[in-house]
Regions:
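Accessory DNA-binding and partner-docking regions appended to nucleic-acid-acting proteins
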Residues: 1-7, 356-358, 387-608
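Helicase motor core with emphasis on the C-terminal RecA-like subdomain
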Residues: 3-14, 18-22, 26-48, 56-58, ...
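Short helix-to-turn junction characteristic of helix-turn-helix DNA-binding domains
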Residues: 31, 227, 278, 368, ...
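Flexible coil/turn residues that form the inter-helical turn or adjacent wing/linker of helix-turn-helix
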Residues: 166, 231, 371, 421, ...
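Short, charged low-complexity linear segments at domain edges
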Residues: 353-382
Length: 608
């Protein structure tokens, strides 16, 4: 059998797919030719198969370096469910397990061994010397670079692999890395003339929405409405601080939403319990800092919310990528405020890589403030261009309309000028709104002519307009002067009537009916691939129930048994024999034999 046929047969037998995704076949051939590679492929794009399939076709064991125990566990469970011999050598195992794993590796009974960078360095002169290693795969390779968004010092020592095992190919894989990070990965791993494979970063199934200027109460209200519209679907809420994860989670729990908390300040046991509860659908939502998610291979996360502005587009892209890994429609929402920008600017200014971190934050700010297709901005950041708008972001769905906002801008700039440019955003809004706050009265600002000049505009709208003014360059924030606002020359031109200012009309989500009642926006939930009707939905729910039952029996996450996408395909195809069941994309030989009878028997009840 030639190599192409062997690759396709292995793909179908173990993973249940009839064809490769873009770049997968090319990458696999390159690795089988014992060549080094750097693979950039978006989350859910099929990175794992790029090294798992070569591992099955080569003699020996593939060693996969992974940063998190949870990520290893997820990958190993998925491989075992596909009938592939795999194991993870890490500190969560007892000594007996690790002894058995070492023996299996030396005897060549494992096709893939997952290992942490620390464990790999400890074993490089012992276990690895005694193994027949087919290839090294460095997962989450951006962790090696100080320019990456998730730098981990222990990864920097991975460069010893090529020195100690020069004949063994190395493939480094990541979902996000800009040019400087890619170059750093290649340099630090000492990759030998590697080929760099970059797949499309486009995730057309993920919708992109930005909400600007929301205060905490408004955010919480909007989040509750969003979660209720999504029914019982799984989602993640990312917060900037540990304290905020706790307060948001408590708010959701009081509303009866099954929600957990995850951040670095919690014990390992607590974090593991939260992660396991989320993976196994015992909780619906996780409120987390950026510490959460890399180890999550959960394919049916349907939404991601950023409570605060992320520090970079890489971080943002990686985190929204945790939604919709199965390719089904998923939603993401980013809340953005000037307070976030000020705090993140302070952090970036105090960091070791001040210039580059400020530049990354500025690009994130440009994304959040954009009035052109957001997906085009994301793709452009990673060096990918497209001539078409996506149609699946808030800008495309509701193109911005502009109006003459000169008077609004003049009111704001006049208030800044009358306080001798010694006020922050919050105090400016208090003055414009006519709020007798302690700071306003303490400085006598209630006597200003502009005090209360903007009381007809709600605080949230002022936040949005001020963000627009900042973006248009009418004022700057002096971060080194207590975040005071400074009028620019462009701002002066508007203030003194030399030029006009166009602002974007603020679009509020809630429409109002003639009777004055708020009308909720309803998200239409449809079965993909053309399935429709109540009967299909009934079958889908029955299949989910059976999947959960089988998963509970094996103590596995439900999506490892079969993904939501496979369940939808079963709803459409409705196989009535085990052979037909095995023809469904995503069902390999092992799953066909293991689960075919149970699922076919259930489907027959709906067909007959």
């Amino acid at each position: 059998m030639d190599r192409s046929a062997s690759m396709r047969e292995t793909l179908k037998t173990y993973f249940g797919y009839d064809s490769f995704r873009p770049l997968q076949e090319e990458i696999i051939r390159h690795i089988l030719n014992k060549q080094d590679a750097l693979v950039l492929m978006h989350t859910g794009g099929g990175k794992s198969i790029c090294y798992q399939l070569p591992a099955l076709l080569c003699e020996g064991t593939a060693v996969v370096v992974s940063p998190l125990i949870s990520l290893m566990k997820d990958q190993v469970e998925a491989l075992l469910a596909n009938g592939i011999a795999a194991g993870a050598l890490n500190s969560s195992n007892d000594e007996t397990e690790n002894v058995q794993l070492r023996r299996a590796c030396v005897e060549g009974r494992l096709k893939l061994l997952y290992i942490s960078p620390e464990k790999l360095l400890a074993e490089k002169d012992y276990l690895l010397r005694d193994m027949n290693i087919s290839l090294f795969a460095i997962d989450e390779a951006h962790c090696i670079s100080q320019w990456g968004h998730d730098f981990r010092p222990e990864y920097t020592q991975m460069g010893v692999l090529h020195q100690q095992f020069p004949q063994i190919p190395i493939v480094a894989l990541t979902a996000t890395a800009d040019k400087i990070t890619r170059e750093d990965i290649v340099r630090q791993l000492h990759l030998n003339h590697p080929r760099i494979f970059i797949s499309s970063f486009d995730r057309p199934n993920i919708s992109l929405t930005v909400k600007r200027g929301f205060q905490a109460k408004e955010k919480n209200k909007a989040i509750l409405e969003f979660i209720h519209r999504h029914g019982g679907e799984s989602g993640i809420i990312y917060c900037m601080s540990r304290n905020k994860t706790e307060t948001v989670a408590q708010m959701l729990q009081k509303q009866g939403i099954r929600c957990g908390v995850y951040h670095a300040g919690l014990s390992t046991q607590h974090r593991d319990e939260t992660q396991n509860d989320f993976i196994n659908d015992r909780i619906q939502v996780v409120c987390a800092t950026i510490a959460f998610g890399m180890g999550i291979d959960k394919s049916n996360v349907r939404w991601v919310i950023h409570y605060n502005l992320p520090k970079s587009i890489e971080s943002f892209y990686q985190e929204i990528g945790r939604a919709g890994r199965d390719g089904l429609p998923s939603d993401t929402v980013l809340f953005y405020s000037l307070g976030d920008l000020i705090l993140l600017t302070k952090f970036a200014s105090e960091s070791n890589q001040q210039n580059i971190n400020l530049e990354k934050l500025q690009r994130m700010q440009q994304y959040a403030e954009a009035d052109i297709c957001r997906r085009r901005i994301l793709l452009s950041y990673f060096g990918e261009t497209t001539t078409e708008d996506c149609g699946n972001c808030d800008v495309c769905k509701n193109p911005p309309q502009r109006f003459d906002g000169t008077v609004i801008v003049q009111k704001a700039l006049s208030a800044i000028a009358r306080t001798e440019q010694q006020i922050s955003i919050g105090l400016l809004i208090d003055i414009l709104r006519g709020n007798y706050s302690a700071e306003v009265t303490g400085k006598g600002y209630q006597e200003l002519k502009t005090f209360g000049a903007g009381r007809d505009i709600p605080p949230r709208d002022w936040q949005d307009y001020l963000l627009q003014m900042l973006q248009l360059g009418y004022f700057e924030i002096a971060y080194n002067e207590n975040n005071h606002l400074k009028i620019t020359s462009s701002g002066s031109n508007v203030l003194f009537g030399r030029t006009q200012a166009a602002l974007v009309v603020i679009q509020h989500e809630e429409a109002v009916t003639r009777k004055g009642k708020k009308k909720k926006v309803v998200i239409a939930k449809e079965l993909p691939f053309g399935a429709a009707g109540g009967e299909s939905q009934d079958l889908f729910e029955a299949l989910r129930g059976l999947r959960k039952q089988l998963a509970d029996q094996e103590a596995l996450p439900a999506y490892i048994v079969l993904s939501d996408k496979v369940l939808h395909l079963l709803c459409i195809s409705r196989p009535t024999t085990i052979e037909e069941f095995g023809e469904i994309s995503g069902i390999g030989e092992h799953k066909k034999k293991k689960y075919g009878k149970d699922f076919v028997n259930l489907i027959r009840q709906f067909v007959e």
